[in-house]
């Protein structure tokens, strides 16, 4: 299997398993009174489950952490800050703008990744790649269209959503930079998740008594699915450029509602979901056929 086919396979798998991971984690969230600190706490426990899975399936990758260069360690430790800030900006944006608007704007992170990859990694920007992403964005817009006008949009809310897209886009560029330096996906994942725990847990320890141990064990178990999703995402970056990896990963927007329908009987518009899926697939196929994907 050549690099482009591997990239498409792993990118697609990352979207599928992210959709499943987010759906299951979302159901756990409904068991709690959600606050920012509780959300950070659950993220830490989820990432603990991912790190534990890495340590079980690839002990050698954990040992390789000590062989990383200083710039690699610093870069990886910045990822949870960017990811955490992005999620914070997204959550704050939904207070002041409609959920649909927040989803659409924050889902532009592949565009930020595409520009960041051009600046920092010298990846080329081809007309086919740009056209493909625009079609993907149209598909994403349709998935959230019904929620676009739930409430009035404010400048502050729009700014938060834009910042979320920027932080998520830069996160992907760092992933690619580190993987280009021959750091294994499992080593990167382990240090990235441990960094999240170290950074987030001290701030959330005060609410430990408010979360049931059974909920914590459940979210940690879901971390196994998160591991598969994140590993596939890393492999997509390894075998392709930033734009394709991110645009395939963003298909979780389709898979999430589908899993929610199959597992929890949540209502969805099947025809709308199919139309969105077709558009997102066409857009990703154009990016896949771009000569700049390797």
Report the location of each language-model feature.
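Juxtamembrane C-cap of transmembrane helices in multi-pass membrane transport proteins
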Residues: 17-34, 49, 88-97, 105, ...
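Transmembrane alpha-helices of multi-pass small-molecule transport proteins
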Residues: 32-85, 167-171, 189-207, 221-224, ...
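Hydrophobic/small/kink-forming positions within alpha-helical transmembrane segments
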Residues: 19, 23, 80-88, 110-115, ...
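Helix-helix packing/entry segments at the starts of transmembrane helices
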Residues: 9, 13-15, 42-45, 100-108, ...
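Juxtamembrane helix-loop boundary signature in multi-pass membrane transporters
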Residues: 1-12, 108-166, 274-294
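Alpha-helical transmembrane segments of compact multi-pass small-molecule transporters, enriched
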Residues: 49, 53, 105-119, 134-135, ...
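Glycine-/small-residue-enriched transmembrane alpha-helix faces in small-molecule transporters
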Residues: 1-42, 81, 89, 150-177, ...
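Loop-to-transmembrane-helix transition segments
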Residues: 6-15, 63-89, 156-164, 210-232
